[in-house]
Amino acid sequence: MNWLNKLERKIGRYAVPNLIIWLIGAYTIGYVFGTVSPGILSYLTLSPYHILHGQIWRLVTWVFMPTESNLIFLLIMALFYYQLGMALERTWGTFRFNVYIFGGMIFTVIGAFVLYGIYYAMNASVISQMPALAAQLSYSIASGFSTNYINMSIFLAFAVMYPDMQVMLYFIIPIKMKWMAIVYAVLTLYEFIVSGWAGRVAIFMSLLNFIIFFFSTRNFKRYSPHEIHRRQQFKSQMRQPRPGSGITTVSYTHLRAH
């Protein structure tokens, strides 16, 4: 990925360190909004119709939509993805992790607008008579686009990088990342098959960053020597866990797409 190396040299200094912390912080704020005043969340969704009518903050605020309604599950999810995200950032470097996460977000936004455009074109005659239908279609689309699959892309990327890393499922059952990733992939494929086109586009576009990552890293010769060193160094550190610092001590209690 020579283009990425060149891009990093040019704008790498603008990368956001500890991006996963900011992402988890956004989820937390969204959870607070949803708890205190649920109506606020309707103004945060990724609704193309409302964005095109001036509510441009939705291009960013959809990231605040809570991925969990249960506080306990939210805390577990936050701990799990914090450790995975920080591990990927240490392995890839801050810039590349930024590209991966922001790339997933950009693809998600593009997917929402593409789907809205298709639906609008298919229902143009009806919308001309019932303008409110455009907003309803947009809200329907927005419900399928969230950070759930962005989170999954983090999990899948980590599983590809460290397939033999072990986690404790339900804090009891030891299981390797590759087996959990297979379960995630099967569940996602099933969801893709049974969903309508809105769901399919949402899943595909949200995971497009992972698809690109997977096909561009299957051959590790594509890694630069510096990247290989970072990866090997992190693996070495993970083999020597310190109290409270190892991913091997983390479990995720409910196995579904987040």
Ranges and model annotations:
Residues 253-258:
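Conserved small/polar residues in nucleotide/adenosyl-binding loops
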Residues 156-157, 207-217:
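Alpha-helical transmembrane segments and their membrane-interface exit regions
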Residues 81-82, 155, 182-191:
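Hydrophobic, membrane-inserted alpha-helices
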Residues 145, 149, 195-209:
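Loop-to-transmembrane alpha-helix initiation sites
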Residues 12-110, 115-128:
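N-terminal TM1-TM2 helical hairpin plus the immediately adjacent luminal interfacial "cap"
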Residues 114, 129-165, 173-179:
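Membrane-interface micro-motifs in multi-pass membrane enzymes
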Residues 1-11:
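Short, Lys/Arg-rich, polar N-terminal cytosolic tail immediately upstream
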Residues 222-244:
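Short, highly charged, low-complexity non-transmembrane loops/tails of multi-pass membrane proteins
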